């Protein structure tokens, strides 16, 4: 049986942690930043985990990561 291809777009957006959770970056950080507060932009820099309902689908896209 052939290997499953990794979805390259998902590979650039998500990383698996040591415990198997999937990390993701926040949205709203690329442009139109002038009206956002420093605190909001600082908090958006922190990583977050994928919701539990999406975890299975994301893991199928990045099987070897």
From Swiss-Prot:
Lineage top rank: taxon: Bacteria
Record's protein name: Large ribosomal subunit protein bL35
Keyword Transcription regulation: no
Annotated Gene Ontology cellular component terms: cytosolic large ribosomal subunit
Disulfide bonds: none
Classification via SUPFAM superfamilies: L35p-like (SSF143034)
Biased composition (Basic residues): 10-23
Keyword Ribonucleoprotein recorded: yes
Signal peptide interval: none
Gene Ontology biological process terms in this record: translation
PROSITE patterns for this protein: RIBOSOMAL_L35
Family annotation (InterPro entries): Ribosomal_bL35 (IPR001706), Ribosomal_bL35-like (IPR021137), Ribosomal_bL35_CS (IPR018265), Ribosomal_bL35_sf (IPR037229)
Family: Belongs to the bacterial ribosomal protein bL35 family.
Keyword field: Ribonucleoprotein, Ribosomal protein
Pfam families reported in the protein's UniProt record: Ribosomal_L35p
Species for this entry: Trichlorobacter lovleyi (strain ATCC BAA-1151 / DSM 17278 / SZ)
Region (Disordered), start-end ranges: 1-23
GO MF, any single term: structural constituent of ribosome
């Amino acid at each position: 049986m052939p290997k499953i291809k990794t979805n390259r777009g998902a590979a650039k957006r998500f990383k698996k942690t040591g415990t198997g959770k999937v990390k993701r970056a926040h949205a709203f950080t690329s442009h139109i930043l002038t009206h956002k507060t420093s605190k909001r932009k600082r908090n958006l820099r922190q990583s977050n985990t994928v919701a539990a309902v999406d975890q299975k689908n994301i893991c199928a896209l990045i099987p070897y990561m």
